[in-house]
């Protein structure tokens, strides 16, 4: 394979998007960007990024942020374990590295929530360290470039492609090279039908030459996701909406939600379950069915809307006033059909 860096970087200089992520290329800004973009499209992430950076401009601010306030900043992005790990990492950065992310790939890689790709992106773009940053975009570009049928989700394939990315890397400009590959995959070498006629690497691309770029990369068939019934109780009192805190570990850890049970309950069973926490509810209206898809399971939601007299609640439950629901309690998108994030 001939060198790809020169035409790639020339294309990147002329075509890269003017994004707020690129206006402040500090290690901290890059880290926040990359964590947000792991499960979120660029256009959707921009307002969250700007709000997050305005509220928490450096690792020290992130480390000190109260957990519910942090989750409220993240509300709408989902996958809350990302921001929980960011706070853990920020505290380590403050304790061990003087409040600045370390200019070392292995040290970055050791921080909670930072994998090979994120460590490579921060190390190369912020610090000019010649290490690859291989995400799904880059895997797709190289599968087509080399006309490679290997399963890109297999660890051995990722390792082999990482070697190829490193072999092509200009050691003087690793950051722009990595960003250019990601940008090419996002704008031109897209999933499904790539825009090969616009690609600066078309003359070098073996997949394009073979007429099969749109058939690559090869991925295994997705596994079927298990379906889990969730019964929701949307209960209002004069003090507000009944909320329940989820467990500190596991799915949606530490977030607030309407009282809910991960099983199918009848109206009478739901009334009894609420009575078990001291809430004497009148269930008046069935909730419309809803669905929320996680990476490994599907919640099938339903339940009842009702009212109850305000009462003392056990630990882990609150009556949330409307203004507190908007400002204090982060409710995950899984319940968005019933509780709208403000």
Write out the residue ranges for each language-model feature.
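Catalytic cores of DNA base-excision repair glycosylases
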Residues: 2-197, 201-210, 214, 280
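Intrinsically disordered, low-complexity, charged terminal extensions of DNA damage-control enzymes
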Residues: 1-18, 23, 186-342
């Amino acid at each position: 394979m001939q060198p790809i860096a020169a035409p790639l970087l020339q294309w990147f200089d002329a075509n890269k998007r003017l994004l707020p992520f690129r206006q402040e290329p500090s290690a901290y800004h890059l880290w926040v960007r990359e964590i947000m973009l792991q499960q979120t499209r660029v256009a959707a992430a921009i307002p969250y990024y700007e709000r997050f950076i305005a509220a928490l401009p450096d690792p020290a601010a992130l480390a000190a942020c109260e957990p519910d306030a942090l989750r409220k900043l993240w509300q709408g992005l989902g996958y809350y374990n990302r921001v929980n790990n960011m706070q853990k990492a920020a505290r380590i950065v403050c304790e061990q590295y003087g409040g600045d992310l370390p200019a070392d790939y292995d040290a970055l890689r050791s921080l909670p929530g930072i994998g090979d790709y994120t460590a490579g992106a921060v190390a190369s773009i912020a610090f000019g360290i010649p290490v690859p940053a291989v995400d799904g975009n880059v895997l797709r570009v190289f599968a087509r470039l080399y006309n490679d049928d290997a399963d890109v989700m297999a660890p051995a394939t990722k390792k082999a492609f990482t070697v190829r990315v490193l072999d092509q890397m200009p050691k003087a400009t690793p950051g722009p090279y990595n960003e250019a590959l990601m940008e090419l995959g996002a704008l031109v070498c897209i999933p499904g039908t790539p825009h090969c006629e616009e690609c600066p690497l078309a003359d070098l691309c073996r997949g394009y030459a073979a007429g099969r770029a749109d058939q690559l990369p090869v991925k295994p068939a997705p596994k079927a996701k298990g379906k889990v019934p969730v019964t929701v109780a949307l209960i209002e009192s004069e003090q507000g909406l009944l909320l329940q805190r989820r467990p500190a570990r596991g799915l949606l850890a530490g977030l607030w939600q309407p009282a809910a049970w991960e099983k199918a309950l009848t109206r009478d069973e739901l009334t009894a379950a609420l009575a078990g926490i001291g809430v004497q509810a009148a269930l008046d209206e069935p909730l419309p069915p809803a669905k929320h898809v996680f990476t490994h399971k599907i919640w099938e939601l339903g339940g009842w809307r009702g009212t109850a007299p305000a009462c003392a609640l056990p630990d882990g439950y609150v009556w949330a006033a409307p203004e507190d629901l908007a400002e204090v309690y982060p409710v995950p998108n899984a319940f968005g059909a019933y509780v709208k994030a403000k």
